[in-house]
Amino acid sequence: MNSPLVVGFLACFTLIAAIGAQNAFVLRQGIQREHVLPVVALCTVSDIVLIAAGIAGFGALIGAHPRALNVVKFGGAAFLIGYGLLAARRAWRPVALIPSGATPVRLAEVLVTCAAFTFLNPHVYLDTVVLLGALANEHSDQRWLFGLGAVTASAVWFATLGFGAGRLRGLFTNPGSWRILDGLIAVMMVALGISLTVT
């Protein structure tokens, strides 16, 4: 359980599974069975780039300023707990996700929209670059093993979400499904945030 690979997988999975604009878009594409592979690939490759940037950048920062780790660690813990509380609020008041119309959309339009959901969301930089970078660098020489775990979680999540959505078409239009998923996310995020403050 203390393996950087496992910790990286769990940390990334906990963050990435929060239902936001990007995941809702991937889910809709999966439910509609439209351009699923390119969307999953774009999301995964984007995370690989962002995770690597976070690990590389924070490695240099912490090498020059070791005390910065404490600031990032407690800031990250507060962010995780806050995000967990937001997930708990969504679980309290879930909303069904209804697939939109049946008119096919061109691949280029879908990819541009997916890129916008990915890179125009400020949380992607906080989650993927800042927070995962800081968590990875707690493992010093094994930070890239943490990164490998995080990248694996990203690939598993987006592939499962995109390709699994078509099979769960009826389930994810039900608000109760969001309640369960967001409830689990809330528990995992708050637990990870608390663990950061005590390590």
Swiss-Prot record:
Q: Name one GO molecular function term.
A: amino acid transmembrane transporter activity
Query: What is the protein name for this chain?
Result: Lysine exporter LysE
Q: What is the name of the gene encoding this protein?
A: lysE
Instruction: State the compartments where it is located.
Output: Cell inner membrane
Cited function: Catalyzes the efflux of L-lysine.
Q: Per the record's keyword annotation, is Transport included, yes or no?
A: yes
Domain of life, per lineage: Bacteria
Q: How does it sit in the membrane?
A: Multi-pass membrane protein
This entry's comment on induction and repression of expression is: Positively regulated by LysG in the presence of lysine or histidine.
Main location class? membrane
What are the GO BP annotations of this UniProt entry?
amino acid transport
**Family annotation (InterPro entries):** LeuE-type, Lys/arg_exporter
What are the transmembrane regions?
6-26, 42-62, 68-88, 144-164, 178-198
